[in-house]
Design a protein with these regions (language model features):
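Bacterial N-terminal signal peptides that target proteins for export
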Residues: 1-11
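CE4/NodB-like, metal-dependent polysaccharide N-deacetylase domain
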Residues: 114, 119, 145, 154, ...
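C-terminal domain-boundary segment and adjacent tail
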Residues: 80-90, 129-130, 247-274
Length: 274
């Protein structure tokens, strides 16, 4: 029986369509596989990039994770003067990084704090920070805490109560207006204070006056107020900002972190202990 010409034409069209569909079916997965491979390569690169942020900041190893915070902070007697703290009595192998004034406002330092998860404490002076509070808002958003370092960086010892109270409470009000917080910790400029300072600080809501045992100089060297000339668990380290010469804040922090690692220590959050 002969097939009508029209039927043969329809069969040819159907066969061609099937062949084209088969080719398309084979091509799509290949393209998908190629795309998946590229995505996997990008993911692997990103994983390596984010898994080792410490290398970008000049460290050969990651900082150890700090231990859980203590159940209780340093005791403070209600109604009495706040304690003056140079170092924290703890067996935890932690030291505490504190930064003074607020003169240096390097955006890369914000990146450093975020990527290394550094629980730093920033003691701010209003006249030094000036219009740069936005920088410290960014630092706070990545884990830094904000504390009080007076309005004008005046040496408080010997000043009358009213003057000292104005310096401390005035900065409390500024920080509350800027960040919605009332700092518990206060550092007197230059570390100098007297009984009047403690009374004024208590009246401004301060629960501890924070000094330091170790201080970092502009060249990256450490000096020690008392005790052995090496970092020990519980040490509070002061890192001034805005040094006229020497290393940047980031560079000094890297050197400090290397020394911390050398001593088998890590960085703790001061506010968890004091």
């Amino acid at each position: 029986v002969r097939t009508p010409p029209g039927t043969r034409a329809l069969a040819a069209v159907a066969l061609a369509s099937a062949l084209l569909a088969g080719c398309a079916g084979e091509t799509a997965p290949a393209a998908s596989r190629a795309g998946s491979g590229q995505e996997a390569t990008r993911s692997a690169k990103n994983a390596t990039h984010t898994a080792q942020p410490y290398r970008r900041w000049g460290l050969s190893d990651p900082l150890p994770v700090p231990p859980p915070p203590p159940a209780r902070r340093l005791p403070h007697r209600p109604g009495g003067p706040p304690p003056v703290v140079h170092r924290v009595p703890t067996r935890d192998r932690v030291v505490f990084l504190t930064y003074d004034d607020g003169a240096e406002k390097d955006p890369r330092f914000v990146d450093m704090v975020r990527e290394l998860r550094l629980p730093v404490s920033m003691f701010l002076t209003d006249s030094v920070v000036g219009p740069g509070y936005g920088h410290f808002a960014r630092l706070r958003s990545v884990g830094a805490s904000i504390q009080n370092h007076t309005l004008d960086h005046a040496a408080l010892r010997g000043l009358p109560y009213a003057g000292q109270r104005a310096e401390i409470c005035g900065q409390q009000h500024k920080l509350r207006a800027r960040f919605g917080i009332r700092p518990r910790l206060f550092r007197p400029p230059y570390g100098v204070h007297d009984a009047t300072t403690l009374r004024a600080a208590a009246d401004c809501g301060v629960t501890a006056v924070v000094l330091w045992r170790a201080a970092m100089e502009g060249d990256g060297g450490l000096t020690y107020a008392k005790g052995p000339a090496r970092l020990r668990p519980g040490d509070i380290v002061s890192v001034p900002s805005g040094e006229p010469a020497g290393l940047s804040l980031r560079e000094r922090t890297t050197r400090l972190l290397r020394e911390i690692q050398k001593r088998g220590l890590t960085v703790g959050r001061l506010e968890d202990y004091v």
